[in-house]
Amino acid sequence: VRFECLPGEYDLYVAANLGADLGERSAQQLLDYTIKWQEEYATLPMSAVMTVAIAPDKGTVTLPTLSVRRTVAKIAYNIRVADKVPDLELRSVRLCSVPEYTTLFTPASAPSTSEKDFTDAPLVELPDAARRSCSGVQYLFENPQGTVSSITDQRDKNADNAPACASYLMIRAARGNRTLYYRVYLGRNNTTDFNVGRNTSHTLDITISGDNEVDTRVHGYTLSVTDDFESNRIGDYCVLPFNASLYVNIERTKSEPTLT
């Protein structure tokens, strides 16, 4: 890139992979500029801000090397089911509590605590080949939700103790007629920290060892469906008209997950 300017000190703002020209904007407008989270990225948005001094020179002045940084965090996960639970199968994975917007050039001064500023990533339904193990990568904007110093055991890094808008991975599995949900919060450690910074990389190696709901990160329910159609059945068909009922019974020990 070549451009002409008078000698002096300048603040240089650079954006990459946005797919659009930002146009002419003041310094304050650039600092306030936000971008929207995307479900998929062909290229990751990047940015940089640097102060440069241009000295008087009759020739060409070469600026210092400028490094752009990603405005997103990379979340990689590797999930496997332990051999001791051969009847437990993975069903889906979803990244939840994803910030919808972020400023392009400046890190967040404070995290949002309003749920309307967050969304969930699309549900990743797992194929039959991934019932016992799966891997994937997701991207999200920074979400520095802080720390909770009272958490001393990773089993207590759960919805009861986490900040309301902290980001987490929701894993759905099945064991027999039980549906299980495993909630794994992001952060810089396995206990107190719920911070996700821009231009960071997080790798979650998760081993599911069972459906023990003593671990407060695990929620499950058993669903049974019965009917009284038998008296009106002919082969595989039910004869109409008749009065019959379909019974749905849900058994669980906790109020979560919410069922609709």
Question: Model regions: which residues?
Answer:
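Tryptophan-paired
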Residues: V1-R25, N78, D83-R198
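Structured interaction patches on ligand/partner-binding surfaces of diverse proteins
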Residues: A20-T62, T179-F194, R198
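Solvent-exposed, conformationally flexible loop/turn segments
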Residues: S47-V49, A53-V61, A129-G136, G197-N199, ...
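Interdomain boundary/hinge segments at the C-termini of tandem beta-sandwich modules
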Residues: I54-P56, S67-R70
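Outer-membrane beta-barrel proteins
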Residues: T65, A159, D236-C238
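A short, Gly/Thr-enriched small/hydrophobic beta-strand-prone motif that recurs across taxa
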Residues: R69-A82, L240-V248
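Exposed beta-strand and adjacent loop surfaces of beta-rich binding modules
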Residues: K74, D87-S92, A166-Y168, E213-D215, ...
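Low-complexity, acidic Ser/Thr/Pro-rich "mucin-like" tracts of secreted and single-pass surface proteins
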Residues: Y185-T260
